[in-house]
Every structure is written in structure tokens, then in C-alpha cells.
């Protein structure tokens, strides 16, 4: 029995047997069908979330290159660049969401529906090459990290995540003949989720600032999601490369790069604004020595335009 959601006819047959015979076996069968239906719904949500996270991680892997192309001062002076729309980054993020849904229902769901009849991959060398190619995709992100002179913690967490994903990919490759296709998917997703939760726990339990936590969380999950997605796709060798979908994939990734870059830039602007507000609230020694007349004179002589961000 597969993980597909039972159709209306199948449910009627099961419940008809349940009411006709009244045996516990039929009751157990109906319970199993219901549980499998909920498992399938959960699987749909997980696959869509995985595709979305893969696109976001691929975008984060090349975010550093945008800071070399576009000057930071120009981007800060134009929050809605290049459309001059304030909410342009948030609106553009809806495109990857719709893209993930389209890719799932167009390509992933038919494969999942036929995985019980899918032939076992008999090209171990090609699987190994694809796994190594997915792992070598970390090198550009690692180079961007070094070029941007990120803190040592970011580089360390990224390298550790690379090592962990390499071990996970090797385990999946070794166990490909000892378990079924669904068991391999379960193994990959289980290891992926566990390592991701451990990574989040490490990041948010350290006494770091929020910008550093966001940076660590982004860069350290890039390799994990990249390797997880590639190790899933190598199980379906004929679905890894889709020439008819190259243009669509390139477009959605490019839009994701731009939107996430401006979102992170907006987070940085908010951090700068909060730091400026904290500096304004801190009492200085010179301000404590001023008299009330001096303070009123200074406030009246200061134009309001200088106080606006």
C-alpha cells in the first residue's frame, strides 16, 4: 500500500467492509488508510517547503556577489531599487513560492505517484558523479564567504555543515541497495531535519548579535539544503536534468537572488536605525553638563530635516 491519498472509491470499499463484517481487521485497515492519508498530506507540505528552502539557500549562496556589483550606498539610498517600489522585495518573494508549487505539482508529484513502479537506478557511477557535483557546489559559496571577510564563526559553521552533508550523502549512496526508494527518502529527510535543528539550536544559544545569527543561519544551511536536494534528485537520475525547464529555473532563481538580497539589505538598514536610536538615547557627559537653556537653544536651532533618516 503506497502513501497516496485514498480515493473516494477506495474509502467507500473500506468503510463498506467495516460496516458489513464488523471485524477488527477491517477497522484496522480503515485506520491505516486514514493514517496514510494524513502522512501523504504531511509529505506534500514537506516537499513544497523543501523546494522553497532549496531556492532560498541557492539564492543565499550567491548573495555576496551582489555587494560587489551594486554599491551599498546606492542601494541604501534607494529602498525600492530597481522598481522604486517600497514593497518590491516582499512582492518578488511570492514568485519563488509560486514557482515551488509549480515545480512540485508539475514534476515532483507525478514521480512520487509512480515511485512504486519506478525502476531502480542502475548507474552507480553517474549517481556518485552527481553527488560530488552537488557537494562541489559549496565551493562558490565558500569563496564568496571568504571574499566578503565574514567572521570566523560563519566560515567554521559552513565548513562543518559541508563535512556533515558529505557524510550524509555517502551514507545514502552506500545504503542505496539495502533499502527501498521510500526508505532512502525517509533517511535523507530525517538526517536533513535533525542536522538543521541542531544547527538552529547552536546558532540561537550562543551569545551573538541578531545580524550574526541570521548570517550564520543562512550560510550554514546552504550546504545542508543543497546536498539534501541533490541527494534526493540522484535517486531519480532521469529527473535531475530537465532541459525544457532550464529557462524557468534560471528565471525563478534570478528573481530569488534579487529579492533576498534586498530583504537582507532592509534588515541591515533596520539594524542601523536601531543602533542610531540607541546612540541617541545614551546620555553623554557633555549633555549632562548643559543647562536647560542650552538644551532649549540647541533644540530650536537644529533643523528637523537633519533628524529624519
From Swiss-Prot:
Cellular-component GO terms for this entry: membrane
Where is this protein found? Membrane
Output the superkingdom of the source species.
Viruses
Keyword set, alphabetical order? Glycoprotein, Membrane, Transmembrane, Transmembrane helix
Record flagged with keyword Membrane: yes
Q: Does the keyword Membrane apply?
A: yes
Segments crossing the lipid bilayer:
50-70, 85-105, 128-148, 154-174, 185-205, 210-230, 245-265
Q: Which residues are glycosylated?
A: 178
In the bilayer, the protein is annotated as: Multi-pass membrane protein
Protein family: Belongs to the cytomegalovirus US12 family.
What is the name of this protein? Uncharacterized protein HVLF2
Origin organism is Human cytomegalovirus (strain AD169)
Amino acid at each position: 500500500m503506497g502513501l497516496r491519498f485514498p480515493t473516494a472509491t477506495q474509502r467507500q470499499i473500506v468503510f463498506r467492509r467495516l460496516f458489513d463484517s464488523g471485524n477488527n481487521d477491517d477497522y484496522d485497515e480503515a485506520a491505516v488508510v486514514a493514517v496514510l492519508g494524513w502522512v501523504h498530506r504531511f509529505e506534500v507540505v514537506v516537499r513544497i517547503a523543501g523546494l522553497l528552502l532549496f531556492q532560498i539557500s541557492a539564492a543565499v549562496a550567491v548573495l555576496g556577489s551582489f555587494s560587489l556589483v551594486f554599491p551599498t550606498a546606492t542601494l541604501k539610498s534607494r529602498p525600492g531599487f530597481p522598481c522604486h517600489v517600497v514593497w518590491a522585495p516582499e512582492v518578488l518573494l511570492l514568485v519563488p513560492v509560486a514557482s515551488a508549487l509549480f515545480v512540485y505539482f508539475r514534476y515532483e508529484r507525478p514521480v512520487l505517484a509512480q515511485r512504486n513502479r519506478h525502476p531502480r537506478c542502475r548507474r552507480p557511477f553517474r549517481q556518485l558523479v552527481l553527488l560530488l557535483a552537488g557537494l562541489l557546489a559549496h565551493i562558490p559559496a565558500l569563496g564568496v564567504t571568504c571574499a566578503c571577510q565574514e567572521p570566523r564563526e560563519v566560515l567554521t559553521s559552513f565548513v562543518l555543515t559541508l563535512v556533515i552533508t558529505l557524510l550524509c550523502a555517502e551514507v545514502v549512496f552506500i545504503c542505496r541497495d539495502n533499502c527501498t526508494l521510500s526508505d532512502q527518502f525517509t533517511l535523507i529527510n530525517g538526517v536533513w531535519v535533525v542536522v538543521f535543528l541542531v544547527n538552529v539550536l547552536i546558532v540561537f544559544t550562543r551569545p551573538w548579535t541578531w545580524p550574526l545569527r541570521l548570517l550564520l543561519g543562512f550560510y550554514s544551511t546552504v550546504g545542508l539544503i543543497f546536498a539534501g536536494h541533490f541527494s534526493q534528485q540522484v535517486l531519480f537520475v532521469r529527473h535531475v536534468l530537465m532541459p525544457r525547464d532550464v529557462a524557468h529555473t534560471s528565471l525563478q532563481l534570478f528573481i530569488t537572488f534579487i529579492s533576498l538580497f534586498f530583504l537582507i539589505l532592509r534588515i541591515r538598514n533596520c539594524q542601523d536605525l536601531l543602533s542610531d536610536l540607541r546612540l541617541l538615547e545614551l546620555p553623554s557627559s557633555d549633555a549632562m553638563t548643559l543647562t536647560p537653556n542650552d538644551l532649549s537653544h540647541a533644540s530650536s536651532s537644529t533643523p528637523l530635516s537633519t533628524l529624519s533618516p
